[in-house]
């Protein structure tokens, strides 16, 4: 049991954590002895359902370990099997409930058959099975082998004598156990006192009475051998007198570590009498009073005062007027004389020993003849060795006389009430006290009566002498409901109670007492009568009933509280049933509705339309009165209006019905609920702020004071532009921290740049406009609205105020763009590459972007023209000048380092000449991400001159003249000695030079040409004074395209290019007309950078003289000189002759075939004739020869 409750607590905690049913039982096995009382605890945790759980115990016997034997249950009396039914019903086996979830199984008289496996089961109260519902443990029942023996004896010792007692303790238990031995002393009528003990762990211990003596060694406990234990008291004291015995217990350790006493045995006792050295004693006689009335009891007490009274022997005798009444020896058996023995037999007298030192004589019914002197005598006796007693000293006190008066009526009656004036409904309580001069002689009968104001008497209730109470006829019904009660409080005191009084209960209440005594014959007779009365005045409840409504706070502020008092007059006690209803008329309405009612029984009923009041309204009724206070907290507009209270006075009837006595309505109370006076103050300080764009604009709005610590603020931020009449809303933060962007923020795209912050202090609001733009300049201010939470949990705006303005100026960064202004002149040859450099020495921002443009001023063109442009996104564009001069393929841009831009013009041409410069624009990003031009600058100019190469064309002027014969060929060579460029090309033309005057020549076959030339010369005479006539023979352009041949030489010219610088013209079939001077004209052409050829220079050779010798004509020359004649003579006859031969052959073969009947059909090959070979001389000097070679005809 020592560890039961800690284990139980741990199991309860584990049950909560596991959240499943867990049944635990005391850990086994437990070893217990036969006949002992055993308890086994069991508890359950983690269950669902009622807190009080049921338990059922069963056992599985070793003889049948699988069979369950039911023992006892907390829920089913029929649960035990027959073998346990009798022991359960007899209370020897029962379950003790420690808590709702914990029990103890008790087996008071353990038997050997009780050994086995015990199971504790808890029926399920859970919604679903989850956990364990039973637990088991083993119980082993072993024989009780503990023996404790001591010699029974009676020892007489004198004070200060020594005492030795021995006790044998032995056990044969097989299990490991410990023994504890204790010596105890017991006196008659007292609890045993431990003298000394040896615990199971071999520790000596004594009670407080013997502890000091044990520490001094006067009390010892010694073990002699294995089983003997000796008690030694060296100096006995009178207090040591009593019975000494030894008690042994056998302990075993349970599995949980606790020790359990399996069995306890005590030996027989040794009675030790200690004779004190002092033998004196005194006697005194006592009684309560000495004057009595017949029938009253009297008691005399004879008190003996001596040392060690229980160990001494005294005899007592009682005497009346020196006559012996009774004697009592040491054995306490009274012996009475004949007269008093008769009275003792009828129960009228008693002689007894109340204690060792007190003796009593009691007479229950005194007689008149019992008046006299009474006394007692005490004699000490000594017991001899033979067991007889001898008288020694005797003593008696003084006599006590008593007087017994005869019986007579001496009663007096007094009536008292709880009040003389009461309120209707209060209880009336009357007490009727009967006083007697002596002891009451008999019995009393009592009648309670009411005398009303009309002197009508009615019986309320009466009590007869036998104690029977009966109500009067008019009070019978009220008495049946408990409205009228009468009671005998004491033998001489009677009470009347009238509950829930009514007005008609007013009047004079009288108590009439009659005293009765039993006569000698047993009949009752009246000894005397007495009566007493008291007046009662009852005030009606409705008298002066009125109700008034008051309030000390007719005007309140939001969230304040106000009280409404409904004062009931007169001041009724709390028990008076009064119902009070508060009615309410909201502002703007004409009807009242019930708000709340404090019912007559103390309950509270809310009206149908009082839901908004319930959580904020407290109704309280004074304990000492019926005044009802209505307290409304967190006042709002909803509670503003007119209030009125209605009181109803009720009376509860004796039959539990209710009667409404009166109803009163109070005056009207008007409650005004006002908003609190605002204390809002916003900082009005003005500020000027100038910053560069892309920096944040920090705007502050400070609330210097506020109405309440619970105030919330809505902050509206405005900006005022000079061009606008009113400010424009940027941002609004509502009182519940919601954001609303204004139209200005939407139009200007400020949403992504706005940042609102409320500081921890609560009264400082900040608006930050990130990445400020120039357009953000303006006058900024905030508009603060103070909002409070109404008692109805609705927010309302209390006040608003505008802050001072912050003048914000956002400017663009200062321009720091600067270009190199170095001037330059540059002269280059065509096809070379030109580098134009543009250097940015400084810029406004490292994040800026540059647009670089090159332009040129052409000679005789006042306007500049764009050559190329590098946009700020690094895109290269050609200008109009590039399109005109075919620069698109020749421009190249490089930027070797930041701020350095180089424009290369490849294959420059003469038309590229001009004055070049670069123009740079610096663009900065605006905070909104748009780029704008912040600065621009133009660099120094560079004059570019593109020159063509110098002409160095030379034609060989030293050419020898030549003479040729007619029909021969002559050559005209044109040799170029030097050229301007290796890439140049030449145009070559040969001319015939003749003198105009006298230079006319005729040649055969050339008369017509001569005439034509003469006509041309005549046409040119007027325009050209040159005496030399130039006639072109042949011209070859730089692109190797031949021009037309001159008419006289047409068909007789052959052109040859022997080398890149040597050209030859051969004139065939020279005639005398070809005689004359000839020259060659050379033009040098170079390619431009645009791949176009242009003429650089021209040169003409010296004239060459040619003389053709004239010869007479021959037939051959005539034929050869005439083409028609040549073909007629030498070519046409031969084909005709060949065709004639072929025709003859075909006719011949055809006739042969006809004679042979179609030879062709027999496969004879036809005659195939191939084209004859015609050989002729290309020089036309020999006639053509027609020959047929072998094989020509198959």
Curated annotation (Swiss-Prot):
Residues 1007-1027 have a biased composition (Acidic residues). Residues 997-1033 are annotated as: Disordered. Keywords: Chromosomal rearrangement, Disulfide bond, Glycoprotein, Immunoglobulin domain, Membrane, Repeat, Signal, Transmembrane, Transmembrane helix. Residues 20-138, 143-262, 276-386, 401-539, 545-661, 676-803, 813-945, 949-1097 form the Ig-like C2-type domain. Residues 20-1124 are extracellular. GO terms for cellular component: cell surface; membrane. Coiled coil: none annotated. Expressed in a wide range of tissues with High expression in Placenta, kidney and lung. Residues 1146-1194 are cytoplasmic. It holds the Pfam family V-set. Disulfide bonds join 42-120, 167-246, 302-376, 432-511, 566-645, 701-782, 838-918, 974-1080. It is found in: Membrane. GO terms for biological process: lacrimal gland development. Glycans are attached at residues 43, 418, 655, 842, 1077. The chain crosses the membrane at residues 1125-1145. Residues 1-19 form the signal peptide. A motif (EWI motif) lies at residues 250-252. It is a single-pass type I membrane protein. PANTHER family: V-SET AND TRANSMEMBRANE DOMAIN-CONTAINING PROTEIN (PTHR12207). It is linked to Lacrimal duct defect: A condition resulting in the imbalance between tear production and tear drainage. Infants typically manifest persistent epiphora and/or recurrent infections of the lacrimal pathway, such as conjunctivitis. LCDD is caused by failure of the nasolacrimal duct to open into the inferior meatus. Likely interchromosomal Alu-mediated fusion between IGSF3 on 1p13.1 and GGT on 22q11.2. Breakpoints occurred inside Alu elements as well as in the 5' or 3' ends of them. This is Immunoglobulin superfamily member 3. It comes from Homo sapiens (Human). The lineage of its organism: Eukaryota, Metazoa, Chordata, Craniata, Vertebrata.
């Amino acid at each position: 049991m020592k560890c039961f409750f800690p284990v139980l607590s741990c199991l309860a905690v584990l049950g909560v954590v596991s959240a499943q049913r867990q049944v635990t039982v005391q850990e086994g096995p437990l070893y217990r002895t036969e006949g002992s009382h055993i308890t086994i605890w069991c508890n359950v945790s983690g269950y669902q359902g009622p807190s009080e759980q049921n338990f059922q115990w069963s056992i599985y016997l070793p003889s049948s370990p699988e069979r369950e034997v039911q023992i006892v249950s907390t829920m089913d009396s029929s649960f035990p099997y027959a073998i346990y039914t009798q022991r359960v019903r007899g209370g020897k086996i029962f379950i003790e409930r420690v808590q709702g979830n914990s029990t103890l199984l008790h087996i008071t008289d353990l038997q050997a058959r009780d050994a086995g496996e015990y199971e504790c089961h808890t029926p399920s109260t859970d919604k679903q099975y989850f956990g364990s519902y039973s637990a088991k443990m083993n119980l082993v029942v072993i024989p009780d082998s503990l023996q404790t023996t001591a010699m029974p004896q009676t020892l007489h010792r004198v004070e200060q004598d020594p005492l030795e007692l021995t006790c044998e303790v032995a056990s044969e238990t097989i299990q490991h156990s410990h023994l504890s031995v204790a010596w105890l002393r017991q006196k008659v009528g007292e609890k045993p006192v431990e003298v000394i003990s040896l615990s199971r762990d071999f520790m000596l211990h004594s009670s407080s009475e013997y502890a000091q003596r044990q520490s001094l060694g006067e009390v010892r406990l010694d073990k002699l051998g294995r089983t003997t234990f000796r008690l030694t008291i060296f100096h006995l004291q009178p207090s040591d007198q009593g019975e000494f015995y030894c008690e042994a217990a056998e302990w075993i350790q349970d599995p949980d570590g606790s020790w359990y006493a399996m069995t306890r045995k005590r030996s027989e006792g040794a009675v030790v009498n200690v004779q004190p050295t002092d033998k004196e004693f005194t006697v005194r006689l006592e009684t309560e009073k000495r004057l009595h009335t017949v029938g009253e009891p009297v008691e005399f007490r004879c008190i003996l005062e001596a040392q060690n009274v229980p160990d001494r022997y005294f005899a007592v005798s009682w005497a009346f007027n020196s006559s012996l009444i009774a004697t009592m020896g040491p054995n306490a058996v009274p012996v009475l004389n004949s007269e008093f023995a008769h009275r003792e037999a009828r129960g009228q007298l008693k002689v007894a020993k109340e204690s060792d030192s007190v003796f009593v004589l009691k007479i229950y019914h005194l007689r008149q003849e019992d008046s006299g002197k009474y006394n007692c005598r005490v004699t000490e006796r000594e017991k001899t060795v033979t067991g007889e007693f001898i008288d020694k000293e005797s003593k008696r006190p003084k006599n006590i006389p008593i007087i017994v008066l005869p019986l007579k009526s001496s009663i007096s009656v007094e009536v008292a009430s709880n009040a003389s004036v009461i309120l209707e409904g209060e209880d009336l309580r009357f007490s009727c006290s009967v006083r007697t001069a002596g002891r009451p002689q008999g019995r009393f009968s009592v009648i309670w009566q009411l005398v009303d104001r009309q002197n009508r008497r009615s019986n309320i209730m009466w009590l007869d002498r036998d104690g029977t109470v009966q109500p009067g006829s008019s009070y019978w019904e009220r008495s049946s409901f408990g409205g009228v009660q009468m009671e005998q409080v004491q033998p001489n005191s009677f009470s009347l109670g009238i509950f829930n009084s009514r007005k008609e209960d007013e009047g004079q209440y009288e108590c009439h007492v009659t005293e009765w005594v039993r006569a000698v014959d047993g009949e009752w007779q009246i000894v005397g009568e007495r009566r007493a009365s008291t007046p009662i005045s009852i005030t009606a409840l409705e008298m002066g009933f009125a109700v008034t409504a008051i309030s000390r706070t007719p005007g309140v502020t939001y969230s304040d509280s106000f009280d409404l008092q409904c004062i009931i007059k007169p001041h009724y006690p709390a028990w008076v049933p009064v119902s009070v209803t508060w009615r309410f008329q909201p502002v703007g309405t004409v009807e009242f509705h019930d708000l709340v009612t404090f019912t007559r029984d103390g309950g509270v009923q809310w009206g149908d339309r009082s839901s908004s009041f319930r959580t904020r309204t407290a109704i309280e009724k004074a304990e000492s009165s019926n005044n009802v206070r209505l307290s409304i907290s967190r006042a709002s507009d909803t509670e503003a209006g007119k209030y009125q209270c209605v009181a109803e006075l009720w009376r509860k009837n004796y039959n539990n019905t209710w009667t409404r006595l009166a109803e009163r309505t109070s005056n009207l109370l008007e409650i005004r609920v006002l908003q609190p006076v605002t204390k809002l103050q916003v900082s009005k300080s003005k500020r000027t702020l100038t910053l560069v764009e892309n920096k944040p604009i920090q705007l502050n709005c400070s609330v210097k004071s506020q109405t309440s610590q619970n105030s919330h603020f809505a902050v509206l931020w405005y900006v005022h532009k000079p061009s606008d009449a009113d400010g424009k809303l940027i941002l609004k933060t509502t009182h519940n921290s919601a954001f609303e962007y204004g139209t200005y923020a939407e139009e200007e795209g400020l949403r992504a740049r706005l940042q609102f912050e409320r500081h921890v202090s609560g009264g400082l609001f900040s608006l930050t406009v990130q990445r400020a733009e120039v357009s953000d300049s303006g006058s900024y201010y905030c508009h603060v609205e103070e909002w409070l939470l109404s008692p109805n949990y609705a927010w309302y705006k209390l006040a608003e105020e505008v802050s001072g303005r912050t003048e914000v100026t956002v400017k663009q960064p200062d321009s720091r763009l600067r270009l190199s202004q170095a001037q330059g002149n540059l002269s280059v040859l065509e096809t070379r590459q030109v580098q134009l450099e543009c250097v940015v020495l400084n810029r406004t921002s490292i994040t800026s972007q540059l647009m670089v443009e090159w332009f040129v001023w052409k000679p005789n063109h006042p306007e500049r023209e764009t050559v190329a442009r590098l946009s700020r996104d690094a895109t290269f564009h050609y200008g109009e000048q590039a399109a005109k001069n075919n620069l698109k393929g020749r421009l190249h841009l490089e930027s070797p380092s930041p701020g350095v831009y180089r424009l290369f013009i490849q294959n420059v041409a003469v038309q590229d000449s001009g004055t070049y410069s670069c123009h740079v624009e610096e663009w900065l990003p605006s905070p909104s991400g748009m780029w704008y031009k912040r600065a621009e600058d133009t660099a120094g100019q560079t004059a570019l001159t593109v020159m063509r190469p110098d002409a160095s064309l030379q034609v060989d002027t030293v050419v020898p003249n030549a003479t040729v014969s007619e029909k021969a060929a002559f050559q005209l060579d044109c040799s170029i000695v030097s050229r301007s460029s290796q890439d140049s090309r030449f145009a070559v033309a040969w001319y015939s030079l003749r003198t105009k005057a006298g230079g006319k020549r005729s040649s055969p076959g050339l008369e017509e040409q001569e005439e034509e030339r003469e006509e041309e010369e005549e046409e040119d005479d007027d325009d050209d004074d040159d005496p030399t006539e130039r006639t072109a023979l042949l011209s070859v352009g730089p692109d190797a395209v031949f021009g037309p041949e001159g008419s006289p030489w047409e068909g007789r010219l052959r052109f040859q290019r022997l080398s890149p610088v040597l050209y030859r013209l051969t004139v065939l079939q020279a005639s005398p007309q070809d005689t004359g001077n000839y020259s060659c004209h050379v033009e040098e052409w170079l390619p431009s950078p645009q791949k176009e050829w242009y003429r650089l220079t021209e040169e003409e050779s010296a004239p060459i003289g040619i003389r053709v010798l004239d010869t007479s004509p021959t037939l051959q020359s005539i034929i050869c000189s005439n083409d028609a004649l040549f073909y007629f003579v030498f070519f046409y006859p031969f084909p005709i002759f060949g065709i004639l031969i072929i025709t003859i052959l075909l006719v011949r073969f055809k006739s042969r075939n006809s004679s042979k009947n179609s030879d062709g059909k027999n496969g004879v090959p036809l005659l195939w004739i191939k084209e004859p070979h015609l050989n002729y001389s290309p020089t036309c000097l020999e006639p053509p020869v027609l020959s047929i070679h072998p094989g020509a005809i198959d």
